[in-house]
UniProtKB/Swiss-Prot annotation:
The keyword Hydrolase appears for this protein: yes
Name of the molecule in the record: ATP-dependent protease subunit HslV
Enzyme Commission number: 3.4.25.2
Residues at the active site: T2
Family: Belongs to the peptidase T1B family. HslV subfamily.
One annotated GO biological process: proteolysis involved in protein catabolic process
Native organism: Shewanella oneidensis (strain ATCC 700550 / JCM 31522 / CIP 106686 / LMG 19005 / NCIMB 14063 / MR-1)
Length: 174
């Protein structure tokens, strides 16, 4: 698994992810890039879960973004609608965190779309650790979204054996 964290603060949204790819209890790769920019660099996305399933989610989501001119929420909802008709999509073992200037969302391999209550979201095996760390930093410091995402990912990597310290970080200022 992995850890992906997204933090939004002061007209900046950041998605950060570690680089570990595991097969069972074995580390297969330590420098994978699980965070990327989509739709003319206006949307950030990160994935956790099975790599093949995550790429399927990425591909489907990116096509929805193109179809709906980069409108994040509409694209996510339209992707979720596909779950009702496409048997292949129904059991993907992956999750996406996506964000643009207006919203941050979780898209699950079960077809759920969730908008987080706070200005942060974290998924993956180290997601709970990263979320707790990020929430504490959001509530008790003036750190930037970038600094909070980086520090919370470091903390998750110190605790979760399926998360390492290699980081890919993308930020969007608006």
């Amino acid at each position: 698994m992995t850890t992906i964290v997204s933090v939004r603060r002061n007209n900046q949204v950041v998605i950060a992810g570690d680089g570990q790819v595991s097969l069972g209890n074995t580390v297969m790769k330590g420098n994978a890039k699980k965070v990327r920019r989509l739709y003319h660099n206006k949307v950030l996305a990160g994935f956790a879960g099975g790599t093949a399933d995550a790429f399927t989610l990425f591909e489907r989501f990116e096509s929805k973004l193109e179809m709906h001119q980069g409108h994040l929420l509409r694209s996510a909802v339209e992707l979720a609608k596909d779950w009702r008709t496409d048997r292949m999509l129904r059991k993907l073992e992956a999750m996406l965190v996506v964000a643009d200037a207006e919203a941050s969302l979780i898209i699950t391999g079960n077809g759920d779309v969730v908008q987080p209550e706070h200005d942060l979201v974290a998924i993956g095996s180290g997601g709970n650790y990263a979320q707790a760390a990020a929430l504490a930093l959001l509530q008790n410091t003036e750190l930037s979204a970038l600094e909070i995402a980086e520090k919370s990912l470091t903390i998750a990597g110190d605790i979760c054996v399926f998360t390492n310290q290699f980081k890919t970080i993308e930020e969007l200022n608006y």
